[in-house]
């Protein structure tokens, strides 16, 4: 393992550093990881790679990349954490705000442009109910990350 890793080693530019730090801290708060340091990210990357190599050695089917660059891995990990939160995964330790049917319909009405077909026709709410709720969850995730950004 390499010591003294920097955000540059992970392809994170200076404008993104605060947000990436906040996201990593948030996922620690969610109980998805215990180490939000770059060394922690690197350890998880190497562990994922070793797991994949072992599975391939046993002729198991592996989905995704067999090896991650640091830049690819941090993006993969942040995306995975976001999706775990949005899908309300069982590993996530968080008290989600309730999304009522009224909240979902109101969001849908205010953001109909997000729910249109290629020809410009809107999907009916019943067709996109789950997607609307996931978008609201994603905004909740972003709000939490933004709050942590302000504290850094």
Could you say what each language-model-derived stretch is?
Residues 1-70:
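N-terminal targeting/tethering segments
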Residues 57-152:
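PPIase-associated folding chaperone regions across multiple families
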